[in-house]
Amino acid sequence: MTVVIGLTGGIASGKSTVSQMFRELSIPVIDADIIAREVVEKGKPAYNKIVEVFGTEVLQEDGELDRPKLGSVVFHNEEKRLQLNKIVHPAVHEEMNRQKEMYIKEGMQAVVLDIPLLFESKLTSLVDRVLVVAVKPHTQLERLMKRNNFSEEEATARIQSQMSLEEKVKNADEVINNDGTIMGTKTQLQAILKKWNIID
């Protein structure tokens, strides 16, 4: 039986590090962010719907989606953000499901759905187990400021726009504390996978 693991965490909690560790263990990872980019490529159904709803001003000169422009349109407008999610989320959901079923058919021991907004998008029904990568609030703030060149205000606003890490931790089957070393994170992951009988 393939175990479907939902991998999530707060912004800048180091989820991609853990995602990479799964890959090193030969466990396939389906990345929602990559799929979200693919489903809105020029000519795809979700792309056509976005152009229909938001107009051609959210396109680059070559006709591809201008992500930063679309991002700023929806970031300050709740109604538009919901409209965009209504187009993109089902398309991402469908493609993730398709890939998941493919790995299950292949008889994989486990498959990981890497979904930053697993709880916010109410996608927990797609997975059997939820693994949350968590860090202390000050670590999260520092990492985000450094990674995205954000001011403290910008970073705080971005963190607050998501469900709190505390809340995610409460709803997790297992939690990896990613404040320490990479080795420490790896040890925690291996212990969890042994507990779930995914690795020996």
From Swiss-Prot:
**E.C. number:** 2.7.1.24
Annotated InterPro entries: Depp_CoAkinase, P-loop_NTPase
Task: From the UniProt record, give one GO term of the biological process aspect.
Answer: coenzyme A biosynthetic process
Family annotation (CDD domains): DPCK
Main subcellular localisation: cytoplasm
Quote the Pfam families the UniProt record gives: CoaE
Kindly indicate whether the keyword Nucleotide-binding belongs to this entry. yes
MF terms in GO? ATP binding; dephospho-CoA kinase activity
Keywords attached to this Swiss-Prot or TrEMBL record, sorted alphabetically, are: ATP-binding, Coenzyme A biosynthesis, Cytoplasm, Kinase, Nucleotide-binding, Transferase
Known catalytic reactions: 3'-dephospho-CoA + ATP = ADP + CoA + H(+)
Residues that coordinate or bind ATP = A12, S13, G14, K15, S16, T17
Q: Top enzyme class of this protein?
A: transferase
Q: What does this protein do?
A: Catalyzes the phosphorylation of the 3'-hydroxyl group of dephosphocoenzyme A to form coenzyme A.
PANTHER family given in the database record:
BIFUNCTIONAL COENZYME A SYNTHASE-RELATED, DEPHOSPHO-COA KINASE-RELATED
Q: Which family does it belong to?
A: Belongs to the CoaE family.
Listed name of the protein: Dephospho-CoA kinase
Q: Which gene encodes it?
A: coaE
